[in-house]
């Protein structure tokens, strides 16, 4: 048995069993190198469709394709060993029918070897979630602010902050849980609502701008590292890597232009005859 195969990777049932226990730690990653770093400290690595914003410069996640998700999902699997890897199902890959969702999700699992998929939507996607889980595909749900719905929402604004606006979101949470999802991301909702959902559904909630009471938390890696020029209110910057990277690039450019780089230690001399 190889060392790689002997290492136990976390599974969807492992995460499901964490309900009410130690907080679940989740970050995004899209590359093998960052995945190897995130893997040391996180329970779950999300290959998010936010790669459309972070890697490709799209304004929204809508243009992201299934092929993009599979390519980066495979890279993250190669770079990680311990964490459960969850790959987002992109817009247009699952909404048309349960069968479309199954074929897309099966491709993701087969071609990346990840442990689960994530899809957006509550009540409207409950039948699809049940269809997938009954066929051996673990599903993480996503309710509250659902970025793939930006064209109908109109803007990225927090949900459940108005009087009488909780019930549809609570219904979404119940539907996802009852359909068999192993966990659910709750994004950008009023804090009391995030707390209530966590207390009332059977599966772990993973908050992103929801509540400290959630069973876990997730952020986009580039946001928390200070690499994104703009970040939502719910992001805490744990680093400011942007200025450091810019300084390194500037230093390289200056040394190339002044011919200070490469120096003697960076080039190869002739071999001497023995």
UniProtKB/Swiss-Prot annotation:
SUPFAM superfamilies: Phosphoenolpyruvate/pyruvate domain. It catalyses: 3-methyl-2-oxobutanoate + (6R)-5,10-methylene-5,6,7,8-tetrahydrofolate + H2O = 2-dehydropantoate + (6S)-5,6,7,8-tetrahydrofolate. It holds the Pfam family Pantoate_transf. 3-methyl-2-oxobutanoate binds at residues 49-50, 88, 118. Catalyzes the reversible reaction in which hydroxymethyl group from 5,10-methylenetetrahydrofolate is transferred onto alpha-ketoisovalerate to form ketopantoate. Belongs to the PanB family. This is 3-methyl-2-oxobutanoate hydroxymethyltransferase. It comes from Rhodopseudomonas palustris (strain BisB5).
């Amino acid at each position: 048995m190889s060392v790689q195969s002997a290492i136990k990777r976390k599974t969807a049932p492992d995460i499901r069993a964490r309900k009410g226990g130690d907080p679940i730690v989740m970050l995004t990653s899209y590359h093998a190198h960052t995945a190897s770093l995130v893997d040391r400290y996180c329970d779950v690595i999300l290959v998010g469709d936010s790669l459309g914003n972070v890697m490709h410069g799209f304004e929204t996640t809508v243009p992201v394709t299934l092929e993009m998700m599979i390519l980066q999902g495979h890279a993250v699997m190669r770079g990680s060993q311990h964490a459960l890897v969850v790959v987002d199902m992109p817009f247009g890959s699952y909404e048309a029918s349960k069968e479309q969702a199954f074929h897309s999700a099966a491709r993701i699992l087969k071609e990346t070897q990840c442990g689960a998929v994530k899809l957006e939507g509550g009540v409207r996607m409950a039948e699809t979630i049940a269809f997938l889980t009954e066929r051996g595909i673990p599903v993480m749900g996503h309710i509250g602010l659902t970025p793939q719905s930006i064209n109908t929402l109109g803007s990225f604004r927090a949900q459940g902050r108005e009087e009488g606006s909780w019930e549809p979101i609570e219904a979404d949470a119940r539907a996802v849980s009852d359909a068999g999802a192993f966990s659910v991301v709750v994004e950008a909702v009023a804090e009391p609502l995030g707390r209530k959902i966590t207390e009332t559904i059977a599966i772990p909630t993973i908050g992103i701008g929801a509540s400290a009471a959630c069973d876990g938390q997730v952020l986009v890696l580039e946001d928390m590292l200070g690499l994104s020029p703009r970040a939502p209110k719910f992001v805490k910057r744990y680093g400011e890597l942007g200025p450091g990277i810019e300084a390194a690039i500037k230093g390289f450019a200056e040394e190339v232009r002044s011919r200070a780089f490469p120096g003697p230690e960076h080039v190869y001399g002739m071999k001497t005859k023995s």
